[in-house]
Structure formats: C-alpha cells, structure tokens
Amino acid sequence: NKLNFSLIGDPALTLAYPDYQIQVDEFAGVNVAEETNTYPQVKAGSKITVKGRILTPEGALAEDFTGTVHPTVLDSKEEVTTLDNRGEGAYTYTERSKTLFSGSDSVRQGRFEFTFPVPLDINYSDEEGLLSLYALDAVHSNEAGGAFDRFLVGGTDDDVSLADTLGPKITIYLNTPDFSSGGQTNTTPLFVAELEDADGINTVGNGIGHDLSLSIDG
C-alpha cells in the first residue's frame, strides 16, 4: 500500500550538529583557508599533510579546545548500479564508496596537523574527493565538525616508492591482551586483532588482496 509510511522520530527536532566548526587551512602544501580556483592534487603513492583549526560558534579560534580529531578521506564519486533483483529496472546512482584514509590525531589549543598516505588503487578520475572531519574535546564536552572537498583525486606521485615489502604487525588474542596461545576461554570468546603499519594499511578494497578477512579453521 503506497499510503503506508513509518515516522521515526520528530521531524521538528533540530539535528545534533556540533556547535564548533572545523576549518582546513592548508592541504598538500596549498593555502586553502580562502576560496580559490587552485585545487590541490591527491596522487596515488603520495603523502598529504593537512593543517587546520577549530572555530567557536562565533567564528574565533577555539584556543581552549584540546582533544582528538578524526579525519576520513573519501575517493571521488563513482557510478553504482543496482542488481535489479525485482526485475523492475536497474537504478544507477553516484556515491563515494571508497575510503582512502581513516585515522585520528591530536588537537592542541584549537589547532591540528596530520599526514596520511594515499593508496595506489584510487579512482584516477581527477574529480573532487571529500575530507570529513570530527573533533572532540572530552574535558569541556565540546564537539566540532567540518568537511573539505576542494581537492582532486588522480595521477601518480613522481616520487612514489614501492619498497614497502613488510606486512603489518598483527597482534591477536581472545577476550583480553593477557591471553596466551592455547589458553582457556569461555564458550563465546571475543576475537581481537590489532594491526599496525608505519606506512598505513590499505583497506580500499579496489584490488585483489586488499580486503581484510578472517578465516577460522579454513
């Protein structure tokens, strides 16, 4: 029945957007604090440094904001087509389905800086990517949010190095870090795998062998 619908929540409620804003000042060595026609290039194999600040609701530098910033870098948009399981016709739409980087870094006196590696299997589209940012000052219970999309994803860095032949360091345990191999567990143990790599871990999933997977007794 096309007249049936479900109402979840109150449409009159204000969305819980952070009061503080995040502004990106520098991206890949380019001053982007002001609107310009210069779009930095995010190339495969490069390392990009981002600098920014936290702004109060009034637009001033939040010098008392100290905490953690969580950046997420998404690839350019790409077309995705549904499987047409119902035989009613496939639907094509665009979305950012690939995450190039997800991490965290510190915020001190309202300012932050972080560097992220760009994987080789990007879209190479020379179209806009997206940097989504969230920051938290747990001491003062302040949150900040922001986004930046004035950069292009494509090309390969001239100084790209393929010398990384070492896999990530993997620490595996059940329930607690004190667990020793062959030890006893309860009937429903929690499996934990901690991965660490100085060059980053590629989870884009755009190539063979780049998906994280777990095989038990396989």
Residue ranges and their predicted role:
Residues 1-56:
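Caspase-like cysteine protease fold
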Residues 28-35, 171-179:
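Short, solvent-exposed loop/edge segments of extracellular or virion-exposed proteins
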Residues 35-71, 178-214:
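Contiguous beta-strand segments within globular domains
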Residues 72-87, 214-218:
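Short aromatic-acidic-glycine turn motif
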Residues 93-117, 123:
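Aromatic sugar-binding surface patches on proteins
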Residues 117, 134-138, 196:
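Beta-strand-rich extracellular modules
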Residues 120-130:
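Short glycine/proline/serine/threonine-rich loop/turn segments at secondary-structure transition edges
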Residues 139-169:
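Short beta-strand elements
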